[in-house]
C-alpha cells in the first residue's frame, strides 16, 4: 500500500490578484476626494475677513452685556459709598455727643467754683444745684445697687436650678447604670446556662458517636473473620477435590499401562 498524495498546488497571491482585476468600488474613492470642488483664493480671503470682523449679532450681544455690567457696577458703587457715608456720619455723631458731655462737665465745675467765690444768694443757688446733683448721684448709685442685687439673685437662682438639675441627672444616670448592670448580669447568667447545656449535649452526642463507631468496628471485624473462615473452608474443600481427582487419574494411568 502506497502513501496517499496530499500535495496541493501553490498559487502566487499577487499573480492571482492581478488576474482577478481591480476590485469593485463601493462609495467614494481617492480620486473623487482629490477632484473635489475647491474654493478660489478670493473666496478664502473673503471668509477670513468675515471671521476677523465677527458677526453683528455677537457684537450686539456684547454691547448689551457691557451696558448691564456698567449698571450693576454703578449700583454696587452707590451701595458701598452709601455704607461708608453712614459709618462716617455715625462717627461724627458720637464725637459730637462726647464734646457735649465734656462741655456739661466743665460748666458744672465752673459753676461750683463760682458759687464759692460769689455772694450768699449765688452760694445758695449753687448749693441747691450741688445738692440736686448729689441727689441725682445718690439715685444713680441706688439704681446700680438694685440692679446688682437683682443680677446676683438671678444668678443664685440659676445656680441652684443648675445644681438641682445636675443632682437629678446624676441620680437618673446611677439608676440607669444599675438597671444596665443588672440586665448584663442576667444576660451573662443566661448565656452561661446555655453554654453548659450545649456542652452537655455535645458531650452526650460525642459519647453516642463513639459507641456507634465501636459497634460498627466490631461488626466489621466479625464480618471479616467470618469471611476469612469461609475462604479457608472453601480452600480446604478445593484441595480435597484436587487430591481425589489426581488419585483417580493415577489409577486410570496405571490400569492403562497394565493393559
From Swiss-Prot:
Residues 113-132 have a biased composition (Low complexity). Residues 100-112, 142-154, 233-253 have a biased composition (Basic residues). Residues 18-259 are annotated as: Disordered. Residues 39-49, 59-99, 180-191, 211-232 have a biased composition (Basic and acidic residues). InterPro entries: Fam133. Belongs to the FAM133 family. This is Protein FAM133. It comes from Danio rerio.
